[in-house]
Each structure stands twice: as C-alpha cells, then as structure tokens.
C-alpha cells in the first residue's frame, strides 16, 4: 500500500511515524514545500532571542527519514490532486497514491493595508521567516497582535536587545486565552520587562520609502524599523478546494471523526482542518501542536484500517514568559457568554488561578505563575469527568483504591479549592 502525505510539519510527521509503527512494509512518500527536516515552530521565538542555536530547532535530520524508509520530496509543492486516478501532481511529475493524507498546515495572515510590502515587515511561521528577521538586524520593533505568538515574539526581541512595542486591537493582552485578571498580570510582566504594551489600538498603515520607518495607529505614530505581524493565520485549503474536497464553514478542510474528507481515501489533519471542539461538539479551528499530532495519529490509523475516532480538540496554551508560567486550557468566561457557569479564582500580585465550571464540569482553567495541578485539570477537562463523581470516589477509600488517579484529582481539587 502506498501512503502519500502532503506536508512535513507536526501533523505530517506524526502521520508518517504512526503508519511506520504499525506497518513496516508500507510505502510512505511525503511532499515538503520547505527544504528543511521537521522542526519545532514553538521554539522559533527561542531562536530569535538567542536562547537556543538554530540547529536546536530541528526535531529530525535528513537521515532520520531514510532510516524510517520515508521517501521525502524536498522543496516540492503539490499543485493538484487527481481524485479520479488517485494521484498527486507537482511541477516535476505525478505520484500515485492508495491513501492520501493532507497536512498542508496554515500560513500567517497580514492585513491588506498600506505599507505591508515595505522591507522590514515579517511574520513568524517558519525557520526561513526567522532567518530573515535575524538577518534584518531589527532595532525598533512593533509586534502587531498579542496572541501567544505575539507575546513570545515580543519577549524574544526584547531579550535580543530591541526596543519593543506590542499592539493589540482588543482591550487586553492574549484576549482569546485569558480573562481580565490573568491578562492584567501578564500585562504587568511584559511592561516590567521594558515592553511597551498598547491595547484598544488599531494599526492603520506602515510608512516608509523602501524600508519600514513608521507604523501609524488610530492613536499615534510609532517610529520603527521592523514590524512583526502576529494577527492570525489562514488554513492552506486551496489545493483541497480545487480538488473537490469540501471546506467547512469556518474555512478549514471538513473532516469527520475519523479524519476522512469528502473524497474517498483522502484524509486530512492538523492546522488545515476544521475539527470538533471536545467541550461543545461544534466545529472549531484548533491550531495547536497537541491537537495536530492526535489528529494525524487518528488519520493514519484509519488509513491502516484500524478504526479510530478523534475525541475532539481542546484549546491548550502553555507559555513561559520571563520565567513565569502562563497557562490557559479550555474556555474563558467570554467564550461561555450566555451559558450558566461558575468561576473560582484566587491570586495576588505574583500568581493567579481561575477555574471555570459549567454543568458540574470543569471547562476552563487559567493560571499565571502556578505549575502544580495543570496535568490533573487537563485530564479532568479532556475526560469530561464530573466534579461530583471525583468527590464521590475520592471520599470512598475502597473506590479510590481501585482508581488511584481520583485520589490525585480529589486531593488537588478539594484541598486547593475548598469552595468547589
């Protein structure tokens, strides 16, 4: 059986490794638009800051593919999928497939405003992007967008010695991950480390002759030589779309719980798909590494004839910003607008935690400066275990002896958060 995989990122590699794990004889062919082995996109800010050398970004070397008998076509983009004859087409020719996995990922979005084509505008999505930033030798930098990538980029550039301004259109830092109190603590961490943070501010244009010289917002003009755009991504679905594969209402490739697309023998996983939110059962775009890897495993197992269903995606953000652990799992309060929920929170100027509960289930967690219990909270959210059930087992020594994990969960919940 020949398996063809489009994409050499986290999802593509997880799919290839899963196929090889269960089938030593399978023929695996991957197409990579980049010329690099798999690397950690999460570590790109650490390369910018100088915390790690460039070589430490890479999770594999070229020989690793050979050792696992994975044939990879470097620097080749698939331009067409012939679903009738079951073949993919590149500028160098065509390749037949028995099963096809699309893991085409996503690309950074830059808004269509004046000045974004000037030298000095960058995104942070690939090794090549960061190579170009470092080669540019930035000094005065504006980072536009304060999501997790924007915050990490701002920190990395400040550590590198740049004067950094971080701009957010909405009213607080990391608004999709943190409610107001956690965000306020993060704001303080950033500003205490010489990052200028501007919220409720809209970028209107970038000015300069050939090179970035100034960024203009609705409130001010900011002198700068570099603009880093971290305002979101767009799914790479054009190839799938023109091949007759259905696209979901949120813009990702539509798949079922087995990662099957609308075309027979074609699967998709990772950033390019529209998956299901574990907590709501509704379509969601979840552009996070753990979800991409699990989706890829599910796609590969179903390709191999091993029926497996994807449980659903959970939003998980774990960042260390200036040595302070910042974590967001599941829903924020804003996401639950219109539903019944309860919030339990505590904190001071150094740490903060917030648990969001709805219908007896923990559906959200936010913490700043706290590391204990995060694995327990994640497990409770992913398994949708009712708090009442944890307490029932935890209080019964005979039951808890049979399910020791409930002891850990109960100790954490009912000792740390007595009001639950």
Predicted segments, located by residue:
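Beta1-alpha1 glycine-rich phosphate/pyrophosphate-binding loop at the start
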Residues: 1-71, 156-177, 376
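Short loop/edge segments at beta-strand edges and connector loops
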Residues: 74-76, 82-83, 125, 168, ...
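FAD-binding core/adjacent interface of flavoenzyme oxidoreductases
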Residues: 1-4, 58-144, 214-221, 228-230, ...
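FAD-site-proximal beta/loop scaffold in flavoenzymes
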Residues: 117-138, 208-214, 218-298, 393-394
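C-terminal auxiliary extensions adjacent to catalytic cores
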Residues: 346-410
């Amino acid at each position: 059986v020949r398996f063809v995989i489009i994409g050499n990122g986290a999802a593509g590699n997880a799919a290839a490794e899963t196929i090889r794990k269960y089938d030593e004889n399978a023929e695996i062919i991957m197409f990579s638009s980049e010329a690099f082995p798999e690397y950690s996109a999460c570590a790109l800010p650490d390369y910018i800051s100088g915390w790690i050398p460039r070589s430490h970004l890479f999770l594999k070397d070229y020989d690793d593919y050979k050792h696992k008998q994975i044939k990879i076509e470097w620097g080749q983009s698939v331009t067409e999928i012939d679903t009738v004859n079951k073949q993919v087409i590149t500028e160098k020719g065509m390749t037949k497939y028995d099963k096809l996995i699309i893991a085409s990922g996503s690309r950074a979005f830059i808004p269509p405003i004046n000045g974004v084509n000037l030298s000095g505008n960058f995104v942070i999505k690939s090794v090549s992007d960061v190579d170009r930033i470092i080669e540019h030798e930035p000094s005065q930098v504006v980072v536009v967008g304060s999501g997790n990538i924007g915050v990490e980029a701002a920190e990395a550039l400040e550590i590198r010695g740049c004067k950094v301004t971080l701009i957010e259109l909405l009213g607080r830092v990391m608004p999709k991950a943190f409610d107001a109190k956690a965000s306020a603590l993060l704001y303080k961490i950033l500003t205490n480390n010489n990052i200028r943070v501007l919220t409720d501010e809209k970028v209107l244009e970038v000015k300069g002759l050939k090179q970035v010289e100034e960024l203009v917002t609705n409130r001010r003009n900011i002198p700068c030589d570099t603009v880093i755009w971290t305002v979101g991504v767009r799914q790479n679905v054009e190839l799938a779309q023109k091949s007759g594969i259905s696209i979901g209402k949120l813009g990702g490739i539509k798949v079922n719980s087995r990662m099957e697309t609308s075309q027979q023998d074609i699967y998709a996983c990772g950033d390019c798909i529209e998956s299901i939110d574990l907590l709501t059962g509704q379509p969601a775009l979840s552009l996070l590494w753990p979800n991409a890897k699990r989706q890829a495993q599910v796609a590969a197992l179903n390709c191999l004839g091993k029926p497996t269903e994807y449980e659903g995606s959970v939003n998980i953000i774990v960042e260390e910003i200036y040595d302070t652990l910042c974590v967001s799992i599941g829903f924020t309060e804003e996401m639950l607008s219109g539903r019944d929920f309860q919030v339990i929170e505590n904190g001071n100027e150094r740490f903060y935690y917030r648990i969001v509960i709805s219908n007896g289930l923990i559906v959200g967690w936010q913490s700043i400066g706290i590391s204990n219990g995060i694995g327990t909270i994640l497990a409770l959210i992913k398994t949708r275990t009712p708090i009442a059930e944890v307490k029932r087992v935890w209080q019964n020594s005979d039951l808890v002896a049979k399910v020791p994990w409930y002891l850990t969960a109960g100790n954490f919940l009912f000792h740390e958060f007595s009001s639950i």
